[in-house]
Design a protein with these regions (language model features):
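N-terminal pre-domains immediately preceding structured catalytic cores
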Residues: 1-130, 137-180
Length: 180
């Protein structure tokens, strides 16, 4: 009986301990659907919060004074990044995502690591300022060339000033939704 009680207590304890962010990447159909819904909501929130403003490649808008836990939503179809603080849309920026041959993965990702200046180990030591890694294969959000269309090897390139500000508000473990 004591062995059974100990086993049950251990199981309950194990379930109550959050998993490491390294194990929290979700690329299931449900996660991809949730990311699409989040992107649809973000698009509508952008119109409500920032009006009909059309951003050109490399541009962003940012509302200071918005507080709360950060959450990032990436829309690959719109080539846009949306930052929420709590339930409020705080910022929007244009992005450049992966190409058809080097696609950006979709789903729900935690920020696994952050580095103010990183260099790619895969692509000719390419600079990746304000790098925020999203998976174990090297996909990250970082400052980079932003032509307004998919042009990366899978990373999410952000306008440099937006990338620096975003880096300042996110934490390892912050959630990033990436929608097709």
């Amino acid at each position: 009986m004591n062995t059974l009680a100990l086993a049950l207590a251990s199981s309950v304890l194990a379930l109550s301990i959050p998993l490491s962010p390294a194990f929290a990447t979700i690329e299931t159909h449900e996660a991809k659907s949730a990311a699409l819904e989040a992107a649809d909501e973000a698009r509508a929130d952008m119109a409500e919060v920032f009006g009909d403003k059309q951003l050109k490649p490399g541009q962003y808008v940012w509302r200071d004074g918005v507080e709360g836990a950060p959450r990032v939503i990436i829309s690959l179809s719109d080539q846009m990044a949306y930052l929420y603080r709590g339930d409020e849309l705080a910022a929007v920026a244009t992005i450049s995502s992966g190409t058809e041959t080097n696609p950006t993965p979709t789903g729900i990702f935690p920020i696994l690591a952050k580095k103010t200046m990183h260099r790619s180990r895969k692509y000719d030591n390419a600079p990746m300022p304000f790098m925020q890694r999203l998976d174990s294969y090297g996909i990250a959000m970082h400052a980079g060339f932003n032509p307004g269309r998919p042009a990366s090897h899978g990373c999410i390139r952000l306008p440099a000033k937006f990338a620096a500000k975003l880096y300042g508000v996110t934490e390892v473990g912050s959630t990033v939704f990436i929608a097709a």
